[in-house]
Every structure is written in structure tokens, then in C-alpha cells.
Amino acid sequence: MASCVVKNWQGETVGSAELSLKVARPETAAHILYLALRRQMTNARQGNAHTKTRAEVRGGGRKPWKQKGTGRARAGSIRSPLWRKGGVIFGPRKREYNLAMNRKERQLALRTALQSRVEDLIVVEDFQEQLNPPKTRAVAQALLRWGVMEDQSALLIVAERSEAVERAVRNIARVKLIGLDQINVFDLLNVDWVLITVSALEQLKARWGSDAAPAVLETPSEDAPQADIAEDQALPGDGPEDQAVPESEHEEAEQTPAQPEAQENQAALQGRPADPQGPEEQTEEPQDPAEELAQGAEPSTVEEAETAPAEEESDD
């Protein structure tokens, strides 16, 4: 934020005004001003320079002389670029030199240029009422009271251009009068002093002031807590089909008893009826060895082990 003095028509300091504009960064300020200045000066060119080629010059359709037999050099047209009044080779052609620049860049360049001249900026009170009738001598004397010497140039910026001010200033070659809507980078940088009225400065601050600058959105930091996920926004892997089955459930599934149909099939293969009560409710009853022999079945291994010593003693 910078401050500049405010002077009245008599050249007395009556206060100060603050000027705080959103400008370019120091490392890019010179480049943005260069782009704006180049665009303004290039677009001021008319581009009317134009020359005619040998095809556009009038005449030259007839061959001057025959090709052979005259001893002269071969010639096909009197409008050849080698001849007098002939066409021009690679001459200037009508063209447009307009350069484009983004609107935000142009505004940034204007704010930067004006803020850079704050040390040479003088705010003056509105003096339209003092020019009645408009006199050039009155404005020239006021410039001296404001501190603008006779050999120094000045740019006078007013809110609205009135006829009285224009008639009083137009005969002073070193002073240029522009309205607030005509402010440009070239005029701001090409003078020794910049004079602006109080009303024009207020409108300028309302249009370009720091309060009117767009707010910068805060970007969330990495340490900020993340928002809770809504219940209806399920993440992949949260569905019932995606949930993993615990190993204990697999083990219980493996330990479940077989179905009745499987029991019947197994009993049919072994040649015995299936037990409808299942394997857990079956009770094994010991059978008599004599009954097993009568049925043609072999005695169990335990019984064979008990009867084997008795048979050996009988043989002895």
C-alpha cells in the first residue's frame, strides 16, 4: 500500500490518498508490461503499405520483341521487376498487425503500471469550476503550483472529459488529457508526472482496488480430516459378496455331518441298511463270536489274540 499527496487548485497539500492495487509479482512485472506495451504499439499500426507485383501492374501483356533474331536479351513483358515501372519483388503488402492479449493480463498490466508510478502520482481536486472561462494560462500556472516544471511532461486523468478542460489543456503540448476509460500502459510510462483528479481516483479504486480483487479459495491441506463417507456411498469390498469368510466358519462347515442321502448311498455300497438316526446316534452292540462264526464272518482281531494262546497250549 502506497500513499500520495492531494493538492487543491492553489497547489496546497490538503491530505493524502492511499493506492493499493493488485499488481504482478516482481519477477514477472517487467514482462507483463512489455507484452501490454508491445500489443498497444503494434495495434496502432495501420498496415496500409502496399506494392504491386508484376501480375498486378497494368500492362505488360504483349511480348516486347520476338524471342530470337534481334540480338537483344530475352524479354516476355515490359512489367518485369527488372524493367522500369515494373512490378516489385517482395514488397510490403496490406496486413493487420493486431496482437491479442488476455483481458486479465491487460488489466494486470494497467494496475502494475499505475502502481509503479505512485511516487510520481499527484492527486488534485476537481477544477472544472475554476475554468470559467477556460484559459490555457490558468492551467499552465496550476501545473507549476502542483510541481510540474515547464520542461516536464504530464498525464492528466479525469473522470469525465468536459469541454472546458479540453479547451484549456489542448494547447499545452507537454500535457495529455485522457478520460478514465482511456487509461493505457504507454501513456502511464511515457510521462514524467501523472495527475489524477479525486473523483477519477475513487472510481479507479472502486474498479481495481484490492477489495474488488477476487477471493482466493483455500485449498485443503493434507493434515485436514477427511469427510465421512455417506452410508449410501459404499466402497468396493463392503458388499456381502465381497466380505471374507472366517476360517472358523470353513472348519465348522467341514465338520458338519453328512446328509441322509449320502448315508444311504454309503450303506448300499457296504450291503447294510442305512441308519435313519445318523452317525452320531448309532450305538454299536458287541456280537458273540459264536454268532459271527455261524454267520460266516471272521472273528475280530481282539478275539483272535485271546484264543491264540489257548490253541497253542492244546497242541502241546
Swiss-Prot record:
An MF annotation (GO) of this entry: structural constituent of ribosome
Keywords, sorted A to Z: Ribonucleoprotein, Ribosomal protein, RNA-binding, rRNA-binding
Segments of this protein annotated with the region Large ribosomal subunit protein uL4: 1-211
Domain of life according to the entry: Bacteria
Cellular component aspect of the GO annotation: ribonucleoprotein complex; ribosome
Positions with biased composition (Acidic residues): 281-291, 301-316
Region (Disordered): 44-76, 231-316
Biased composition (Basic residues): 60-71
Biased composition (Low complexity): 255-270
InterPro entries in alphabetical order: Ribosomal_uL4, Ribosomal_uL4-like, Ribosomal_uL4_dom_sf
BP terms from Gene Ontology: translation
Region feature Unknown, mapped onto this chain: 212-316
SUPFAM superfamilies on file: Ribosomal protein L4
Function: One of the primary rRNA binding proteins, this protein initially binds near the 5'-end of the 23S rRNA. It is important during the early stages of 50S assembly. It makes multiple contacts with different domains of the 23S rRNA in the assembled 50S subunit and ribosome.
PANTHER family listed in its UniProt record: 50S RIBOSOMAL PROTEIN L4 (PTHR10746), LARGE RIBOSOMAL SUBUNIT PROTEIN UL4C (PTHR10746:SF17)
Family: Belongs to the universal ribosomal protein uL4 family.
Oligomer and partners: Part of the 50S ribosomal subunit.
Protein name in UniProt: Large ribosomal subunit protein uL4
Organism: Synechococcus sp. (strain JA-2-3B'a(2-13)) (Cyanobacteria bacterium Yellowstone B-Prime)
